[in-house]
């Protein structure tokens, strides 16, 4: 594919404005055919010359992108270093979580104003938009995870980073109780005091009370989830290959991959899985390729409701061409080891129960509040009306609790539960916390001067400081929606972009989006290390196929 210089420059400019979303957006390829959504190209075999030319183009493009991404990452790293103001009184701030909201907050906090402590059950930040790519080996998990200690080197004292789970919060005494999650400190508890608390623990998987989902299904929210899916895929393929005496029914069941949830996460996994079947199973398990298939189940009337109608139609047509079956208006009622029990709404409005055999179930049907969040919602009187998360105001202050803030999926703000929202919330909160930190430092200086100089001389000395305090104002949060992206398979994607000079969303679809997506997410990857490793993974997949060793 050749792209004009002007168009490439346009794509680069757009990549700086498009964010990422948490369960929402992952990889995608975008075409300039904005309105011709029904014209879906059919996958085709490429000649050796075409593939060689494509490889050369990809190599040169990725080399250029790698240099740009490396420069940008080093620049961000330099800008995030501590300012090191000496002698300024600091408040102790505890941040719970290591996801989008927590990381954005810490990255933007001024370490000269706060002593920062981080508590998280995991020791890394996960770039969730690319997680579906790890389920089939397009990318490797280490490429999209960043160690917390390395990420905040020079900003947080390593002794203040705790791989632990917060089990209780005493909002009156301003203390959190944590329990270790590593082998070395598993089960051990500690208590950490705070002046300010940032609650950013995210959300859990919504199962609607169906126990069989947790017993037999796979989720797609954490790094370990992707590894579990990856291993399960190969277990199924090897089991069917080895056991020649399987009945036709059992063989068909094992080779049926089912996905529940028609949002971006579910759609993107289905797309990645079909790519794996079309491009890699044919080489590793050629006798199984024609039989393994993917079905996506969605309770609502349609998939991807956050996108424009033309993009939804494009995706549905593409999935049909790729042999991915979509079942809408289908509610999962129960899950056992081998079957899904669903209720299907027919075109005439009647309902019918159906049993769907499956070999692997990937559950991507939404999120729900974590137990600690639910405990807070039930124990704080001002949170009595909370359902999806803690009720916060426009400054992210938790209603009913002083000096406690909440951002991301654990907070209810009326906005979608996406990485884009959490990232903006975390950065905005940090900006306001820096204002609060400056006010605190100025008040401390004023009190010290008044104590040192006495009541007669102090007013003239502290007048300027008090004026500075008056000028420091908090700003209510303003969300800037920048678009939605989703990979839909066969090196194609969809995107609704919000551009500052346009009132309506700009819908994009198809192959050009692959370049756009890579530019956008390379720019958003949190470190030069991750950018380099992702580039290598893409190149490796292009040249040698997907990663196929279960390690």
Swiss-Prot record:
Q: Name one GO cellular component term.
A: mitochondrion
Q: List ligand-binding residues for FAD.
A: 92-122
Positions contributing to NAD(+) binding: 255-291
- A GO molecular-function term, please? oxidoreductase activity
Q: Which InterPro entries match?
A: FAD/NAD-bd_sf, FAD/NAD-binding_dom, NDH-2, NDH2-like_C
What enzyme class is recorded for this protein? oxidoreductase
- Broad class of where this protein is predominantly found: mitochondrion
Its recorded reaction(s) are: a quinone + NADH + H(+) = a quinol + NAD(+); a ubiquinone + NADH + H(+) = a ubiquinol + NAD(+)
Q: What processes does the entry annotate via GO biological process terms? A: mitochondrial electron transport, NADH to ubiquinone
Q: List its EC numbers.
A: 1.6.5.9
The residues forming the transit peptide are 1-35
Q: Which SUPFAM superfamilies match?
A: FAD/NAD(P)-binding domain (SSF51905)
Q: What's in the keyword line of the UniProt record?
A: FAD, Flavoprotein, Mitochondrion, NAD, Oxidoreductase, Transit peptide, Ubiquinone
Q: Where in the cell is it found?
A: Mitochondrion
Residue ranges the record marks as coiled coil: none
Q: Does the keyword Secreted apply?
A: no
Q: Name the family.
A: Belongs to the NADH dehydrogenase family.
Any idea what job this protein has? Catalyzes the oxidation of NADH.
What name has this protein been given in UniProt?
Probable NADH-ubiquinone oxidoreductase C947.15c, mitochondrial
- Source species, please? Schizosaccharomyces pombe (strain 972 / ATCC 24843)
């Amino acid at each position: 594919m050749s792209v004009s210089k002007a168009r490439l420059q346009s794509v680069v400019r757009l990549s700086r404005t498009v964010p990422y979303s948490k369960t929402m957006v992952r990889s995608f390829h975008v075409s300039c055919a904005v309105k011709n959504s029904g014209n879906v190209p059919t996958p085709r075999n490429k000649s050796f010359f075409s593939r060689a030319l494509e490889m050369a183009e990809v190599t040169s493009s990725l080399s250029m992108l790698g240099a740009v991404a490396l420069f940008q990452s080093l620049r961000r790293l330099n800008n995030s270093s501590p300012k090191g103001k000496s002698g300024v009184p600091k408040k102790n701030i505890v941040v719970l979580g290591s996801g989008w909201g927590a990381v954005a907050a810490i990255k933007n906090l001024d370490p000269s104003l706060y002593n920062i402590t981080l508590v998280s059950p995991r020791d890394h930040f996960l770039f969730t938009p690319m997680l579906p790519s790890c389920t089939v080996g397009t990318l490797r998990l280490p490429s999209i995870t960043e160690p917390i200690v390395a990420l905040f080197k020079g900003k947080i004292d390593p002794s203040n980073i705790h791989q632990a789970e917060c089990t209780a919060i005493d909002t009156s005494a301003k203390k959190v109780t944590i329990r270790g999650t590593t082998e070395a400190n598993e089960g051990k508890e500690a208590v950490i005091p705070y002046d300010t608390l940032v609650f950013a623990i995210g959300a859990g998987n919504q199962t609607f009370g169906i126990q069989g989902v947790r017993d037999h299904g796979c989720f797609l929210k954490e790094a370990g989830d992707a590894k579990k899916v990856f291993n399960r895929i190969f277990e199924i393929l090897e089991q069917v290959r080895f056991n020649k005496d399987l009945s036709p029914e059992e063989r068909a069941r094992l080779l049926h991959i089912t996905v529940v949830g028609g949002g971006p996460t579910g759609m993107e996994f289905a797309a990645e899985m079909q790519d794996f079947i079309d491009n890699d199973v044919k080489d590793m398990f050629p006798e199984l390729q024609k039989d393994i298939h993917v079905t996506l189940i969605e309770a609502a009337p349609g998939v991807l409701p956050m996108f424009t109608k033309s993009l939804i139609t494009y995706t549905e047509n593409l999935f049909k061409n790729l042999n991915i079956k979509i079942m809408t208006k289908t509610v999962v009622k129960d899950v056992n080891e081998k079957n899904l029990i669903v209720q299907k709404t027919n075109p005439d409005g009647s309902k019918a129960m159906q049993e769907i055999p499956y070999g692997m179930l990937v559950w991507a049907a939404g999120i729900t509040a974590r137990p600690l969040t639910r405990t807070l919602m039930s124990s704080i009187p001002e949170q009595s009306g909370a359902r999806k998360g803690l009720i916060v105001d426009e400054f992210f202050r938790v209603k009913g609790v002083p000096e406690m803030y909440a951002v991301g999926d654990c907070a209810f703000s009326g906005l979608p539960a996406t990485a884009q929202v959490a990232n903006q919330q975390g950065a905005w909160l940090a900006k306001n916390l820096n204002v609060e930190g400056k006010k605190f430092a100025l008040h401390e200086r004023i009190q010290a001067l008044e104590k040192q100089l006495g009541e007669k001389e102090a007013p003239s000395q502290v007048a300027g400081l008090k004026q500075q305090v008056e000028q420091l104002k908090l700003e209510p949060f303003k969300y800037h929606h920048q678009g939605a992206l989703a990979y839909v398979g066969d090196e194609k994607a969809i995107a609704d972009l919000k551009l500052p000079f346009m009132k309506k969303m700009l819908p994009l679809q198809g192959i050009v989006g692959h370049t756009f997506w890579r530019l956008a997410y390379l720019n958003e990857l949190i470190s030069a290390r991750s950018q380099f490793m992702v580039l290598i993974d893409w190149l490796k997949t292009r040249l040698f196929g997907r990663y196929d060793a279960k390690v």
